[in-house]
Amino acid sequence: MSSSSNPVSQFNNISLGGRISGTRGILKFTTNNITWKSENGKIETVSSSDIKRANWARVTPRIFQLILSIKGGATVKFDGFKEQDYEVVRKYLSDQYNVSPLEIIELSSKGCNWGEVKVNGPMIQFTTDHGKVGFEFPISEVSQSVIGANNKNELTLEFHHDKAMDDDDETMVEMRFFTPIRPSKEGEEGGKEKKVGEDGEEDEEDEEDAEKEEEISALEQFQQTIMNKSDMVSNVGKSLVVFSAIQFLTPRGRIDIEMYPTFLKLHGKTHDYKVPYESISRLFQFFRPDQKHIFFIISLDPPIRQGQTKYAHLVIQFQAEENIHLELNLTDELQQKFKDQLSPIMNGNANALICKILKALTGKKITIPGNFQSDSGANSIKCSLKANEGYLYPLERCFFFVHKPPTYIKFEDISNIEFARYGAPSVRGGSNRTFDLSINLKNSTSIQFVNIQREEYPSLFNFLKEKKLSILNPVTTGPAMIIDDDDSDDDDYEPSESGSESDEGSASDESEEESEEDKKAKKKQKK
């Protein structure tokens, strides 16, 4: 702790208490505010006039926590104080903010893993014996909640990932609560109470089933409270729009999408996910070769988790001709903010509408394929990744394979590319109907796409040469091997409510598009 004369006191190596991750920073007390600034520049400020009460608690043998109760029911905590800091903090709060006393509270330290869990304002609180708090954390930290498919008495909470954390930092990613079935009441003879049915049989099983249903219902209510409170803590109120029963390929299932001003919520049969818009890194839209379905892909950084499985890409499939009617809950402020992008009533193609809304809310451009065409005229090549058949889309600065697993490969990460099983058709017995494509990455891993139709080789070879990707074993014989040096770019998708591609924008400075410097270099080469 470093301290200067009042009215300023400063404490180093302080983290926001009660958070799942513990990014450190500097805490400064000034006349009007308490300000915390993290190592990466994030700032949290508490006005001195908003402080109602202050508590002091030991959280480890050597580390103490300052707990501030704020007007409106919120709680702000700061971890990292030393025992000798108590008197400095107490005196400052009393003299400068007229907040006293700095009450010392005792947390449960017995290590019990059983107790009562409840929602206390914006916090989830776990209490043990004699009502002592074992731990608590903000509901806003919860990214998703899951009731086990095979164990209906278990609720799993997963937490948001803090991008500011280093790779070697530790953070909690998951917590599970188990609700045991309450024992049946004992009868006068010390056994279970027994009910007798109309047929004279004892209905012990019915009683146990009723108790089990009661416990499961309580767990589901607790889960719903968490998700509802999660929205309330974010001060977002009612959702802007809901898309019901949308077909997801990854993760698989029919999922409802609820969109809010700062995040979207995915609600499935067994899982709920909360996805902040700031974690959406890219948006893609690809037509399937049959032109009857559209892939819409939401790339996430960090990915969401389902148990031990991470989903870095959400893959949605729409019918190309599906039209819907939407009514958006836009406040006057939101209407003013998105006046050129969103309107209270929207009609049109389902895919185009969700693209338009997400583009407005996230500020991300939607990348669609450029001018690459396969032998059949499609923007993709049919192939398999491991045992899963799908489509490989060559884009301006990356490859994207849809859909299982969805795989994103940036050109800058590629070391070289190798063709396999491509036999020259002029050699008897040397011709294969399919060939394989191995993409070797700079991190020494390799991704192999197999069972590509040999007719796709010329267009794929030309594309790789145009992008100046290193090919280890090029086959340049044959009449079709002519490099088509056009300045094709992936277009930015400007979704129209009709869903047609006639309103697509031209190339700009999006990361998936070709830079002006690259274009000038190509023109010089042509000259």
UniProtKB/Swiss-Prot annotation:
Localisation per UniProt entry: Nucleus; Chromosome
GO biological process, one term: regulation of chromatin organization
Origin superkingdom: Eukaryota
Pfam families linked to this entry: PH1_SSRP1-like, POB3_N, Rttp106-like_middle, SSrecog
Biased composition (Basic and acidic residues): 183-198
Disulphide-bonded residues: none
GO annotation, cellular component aspect: FACT complex
GO terms for MF: DNA binding; histone binding; identical protein binding; nucleosome binding
Region named Disordered: 179-213, 479-527
Location, primary (coarse class): nucleus
Composition skew (Acidic residues), residue ranges: 199-213, 483-516
Alphabetized InterPro entries for the sequence: PH-like_dom_sf (IPR011993), RTT106/SPT16-like_middle_dom (IPR013719), RTT106/SSRP1_HistChap/FACT (IPR050454), SSRP1-like_PH1 (IPR048993), SSRP1/POB3 (IPR000969), SSRP1/POB3_N (IPR035417), SSRP1_DD (IPR024954), SSRP1_sf (IPR038167)
Gene3D superfamilies xrefs: 2.30.29.150, Pleckstrin-homology domain (PH domain)/Phosphotyrosine-binding domain (PTB), Structure-specific recognition protein (SSRP1)
CDD domains per UniProt: PH1_SSRP1-like, PH2_SSRP1-like
Keywords: Chromosome, DNA damage, DNA repair, DNA replication, Nucleus, Transcription, Transcription regulation
KW Transcription (keyword) present: yes
Family: Belongs to the SSRP1 family.
Function text: Component of the FACT complex, a general chromatin factor that acts to reorganize nucleosomes. The FACT complex is involved in multiple processes that require DNA as a template such as mRNA elongation, DNA replication and DNA repair. During transcription elongation the FACT complex acts as a histone chaperone that both destabilizes and restores nucleosomal structure.
Name assigned to this protein: FACT complex subunit SSRP1
Primary gene name: ssrp1
